[in-house]
Structure formats: C-alpha cells, structure tokens
A protein has these predicted regions:
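Secretory targeting and sorting signals
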Residues: 1-28
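Cell wall/extracellular polymer interaction/catalysis modules
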Residues: 34-221, 232-243
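Extracytosolic low-complexity repeat regions of secreted or lipid-anchored proteins
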Residues: 223-225
C-alpha cells in the first residue's frame, strides 16, 4: 500500500488469500481488555450487528473482529466468538487505528488514498517477523529478505505477497512512484504480527490492497486497521480457518 508521511503508520499487506503467490503494561492505559465479558447477540449466517458494526459472516463463521470508528482515525477493535447460536465478546482494544483519511465504500477506494474500506472480509492467513509457532495457523508466513506486497498495477501479481526473486513485478520502483510495491521488512514494528484481509482479492487495478490488521505504529494507518501489540499477539493463536474468521469494518 502507499507510504505514509513519517508521522503516520504505514499500512499493511496480504500473502496467499487462498491461492496467492506463495503486551506491554504501558499499552493498557489506552485499551481495555474485556475477556470473558458477555455481550451477546443472536447469530446469523446473513447479517448481524456487533458493537454497532454490521457483520456479514460466512455460513460457518465462528470468529469475528469488529472495527468501530469512534472519531477521526481512531477506533474500537473487538474480538468475538460464536457458540450455540450466540456471539460473545472476548476482548477489546480501544486504541485501534484506521486510515488517515477515514473510511470509504470498497468500490470507491483508490490506491494511495489513505482510506480504509468498509465491509466484511475474510482473514485467510497471517505473517510476521517471528518463526512459526505451534499455536498459529499453518498458513502463517515469516517475512524474509526480498518479500513484498505487490502494488504494481501492471503486474499480474497485483495485491499479492511475493518475493522479488520470483520476478513478475517492478520491485525496484521508488516509494514515490504510484506503482511501487511494499517491502515488508521496512515495517518490523507494524508487521511483527500481521493478519491479511481479503479486500480486493479480485485484483481490481487502482483500487489498492495490502489491507491488514496489524500492530499500531505511531499514528494513523494508510488504509489498514491496526491495534495494540497485545491485542494482535493474543488474537493470532486464536484464529482458526475451520471457523471462517472475518473482520467487519464500520462506523
């Protein structure tokens, strides 16, 4: 995704959307965990409202992350699970972030706009700076030298995770270029723990991509959703593809 000014957090990325190229105590003053607190809503396979956000889960979805913008580029990020037909709130971060230019309907999003797409998206896999851990989904990828998120509009690998050694995109373009791709190792803090969303899996050119759920940086994102480190770290081992996890972004 396009780069941000240095005072802002740069946004995230996306490896194999099902066939792509292959907590500190100080943070808790701004966030609130609500593990075990019940905030139950009737489950639905078509649409449900959780924390004021409209969620359109898949038929077998049992895990949801909601993102509710509270003001500007700030938001509340909550993890929910479904059991016996009811949705239960498990934990929440109040210091979530979205794009520096707010929210936008997905079909109106433009690459480099700094806007986060509204809607419900799958969470197909994760990546980060750490070696694979037993509790994480097997689809996890550890960032290695030469890994990029392709945002080159002329590449057939657009909006895909790819290593430059495999070619097929202009990885050498400078960050100032409209078709520059994102080198993942440039963001070790934000992408220490990062979860890919299925936004623009169809690779519509100029719509952008690299929309992730990742660790907070110093400010807003360039389109991703971010949350405190403790939240993402706690979420990672809980996500289970057999439970069809999704993220729902609203306001």
């Amino acid at each position: 995704m396009s780069r941000l000014p240095t005072v802002l957090l740069l946004v995230g990325l996306l490896p194999a959307l099902g066939g792509l190229d292959a907590v500190s105590a100080g943070a808790r003053h701004a966030t609130t965990e609500v593990a075990g607190e019940l905030a139950v809503a009737r489950a639905s396979t078509s649409e449900v409202r959780l924390d004021g956000v409209t969620v359109r889960p898949r038929a077998n979805t049992r895990q949801v992350v909601t993102v509710n913008r509270t003001s500007g580029w700030h938001g509340r990020v909550t993890y929910w699970t479904r059991t016996d037909g009811q949705w239960t709130k498990r934990f929440r971060a109040r210091d979530g972030r979205i794009g520096y230019n707010g929210l936008v309907r997905p079909k109106r999003r433009v690459q480099g706009s700094g806007k986060t797409p509204l809607g419900t998206y799958r969470l197909p896999f994760s990546f980060g700076t750490h070696p694979q851990r037993a509790a994480w989904d097997p689809s996890y990828r550890r960032i290695r030298s030469g890994d990029y998120w392709v945002l080159d509009n002329e590449s057939r690998h657009y909006n895909r995770y790819r290593n430059k050694s495999r070619g097929g995109f202009r990885w050498w373009l400078p960050a100032s270029h409209a078709d520059s791709s994102e080198r993942l190792r440039d963001y070790p803090k934000q992408y220490e723990f990062s979860i890919v969303t299925s936004f623009n899996a169809a690779q519509v050119r100029r719509r952008g991509g690299a929309i992730f759920l990742h660790v907070n940086g110093s400010g807003a994102t360039a389109g991703c959703v971010s949350a405190p480190r403790w939240f993402i770290k706690r979420l990672m081992p809980r996500l289970d593809q057999d439970r069809a996890p999704v993220i729902a972004i609203g306001s």
